[in-house]
Each structure stands twice: as structure tokens, then as C-alpha cells.
């Protein structure tokens, strides 16, 4: 009989808790370790839609990257908060919840290593190792590697296509792409370190205004590919690892969990013009020249 404790032990073997940031909340956040597990649902987030899916499937355990309890001082488990309502639902249906968050970001074969592989980087390595694991492998947050030198536009298309993004936010640092750093999720604060490491391009998500400005001043191509799209590629891989480790357990990758963020633009390119705005007026600025040419 496979138990929650068995699943937890395995997950912590590939993403040890000591790799997690001190402020993080990882591991078993809901449920009993002794509970038998016959069916697992894997998803990036423990959102309501994922919990409802787990109930419909009859899952015993949800395994996610992001923690259900995070960044809040939870003083009561009741219906006053969404976290409380989710916890109550899980407990009422006997569903346990495990997450591997920043420990999975840091771990060999984790979030950022998979992101680097997904973008077809070569010579992938930990940019600034935090330590070595029991097998002597470096671990740490940021990964770096190389691609054949190419124009930024080509690499943007690669990122958008390979990660399945609806759109990208980016700053053109004025250099072709060759040496690339990646950090899934909210790693925009590492742009200065990326520059010091000699990277001309940094792919991450949740980038702030001042981080884009810093990248521009440092001459780094900074690409925001979205939190979901930079982290979710690891989750089906984790699901497959669980299937191999526990062949007697049914492991299902969530079909309902999707990125809820969408891009909206009020501009609609028709032919060579932005409707209602003469191209002569727009052509004074490089960005709008691109709009007028239709190669945005």
C-alpha cells in the first residue's frame, strides 16, 4: 500500500526541503501521512478548479508546485478566506495536498533546468550554485546556457512557440542572443546578476517596471514569458516520474488548470495602418514604425 508519506518521501528526494527558501512553505500542507494513495492529481497550482477536478476524479492526493498556504498568517481554517474554504473542501473529501515550491525551482531536474531544456539551451549549468546535493550535483536558482547566435526577434519567436505563450513582454538590450539565463516564475530581480554572468538574454516572468529599465541600461534582453508558462513545463514531467516510481498508483496531470492571464491590445493592424491613426504620425517612434509595417 502506497501512502502519502511514501509520496512525500519521494518528492523530497528529488526536491529536498533544504533547497527551499527560508520564507517558503513546502511539503505536506494538508492531510494525514498514513492515508493510502491510489490516485494522484498533479498541477501547477492548488486552485479551486484543480480541487474540484480532484474530487470529480476521486483523487486521494494533489501534488502541486505552488503551496496552498503561502504568504499569509493563517489563524483559522474557516469559510472567511479562499484558502480556508479550499482547506475545508480538501479535508471534507479526505484529499491530501503536497507541494514542492522553491526547492523544485532549485533542484537538479527541477523548474529552471526543465525551462532551459525546453528552450533548447546547450551546456546548461547552475549560474551561481548554492551548494551540491547528495550526488554531487550543483543546485541553485538560475540556469544558464547557450543557443546559436541569432537576432532577438528569432529568439522571441522560439520562446513564444516552445512555451506556448499568448504573448511576451520584453526589453531589447541591443544585442544578439547567444548566452541565455533562465529563471522560471518571479526572477526579474536577478537581471543584474545575469549581466555580471555575461548573459545577453534573460528569460523569466513577473518582471517589474524598474527591472525592465535596469535590463535596458545594462544591455540585457529581458523577456517576460509569464509565470505559468515558465514553470508549468516541469509538472507533466513530475507526473511521469511519479508514475514510474509508483506503478500501482494512478497519476493524472490536470486537464483543467490553465493560465488565466490574457493579453489585450486596442490596436488592430489592417493592411499597413493602425485604424484611425495616420502612419505618418506614428513613424516618428521606432515602436510605432514597427506597428505601421505590420511586423510587430
Name each region found by the language model.
Residues 1-271, 276-296:
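Hydrophobic structural segments
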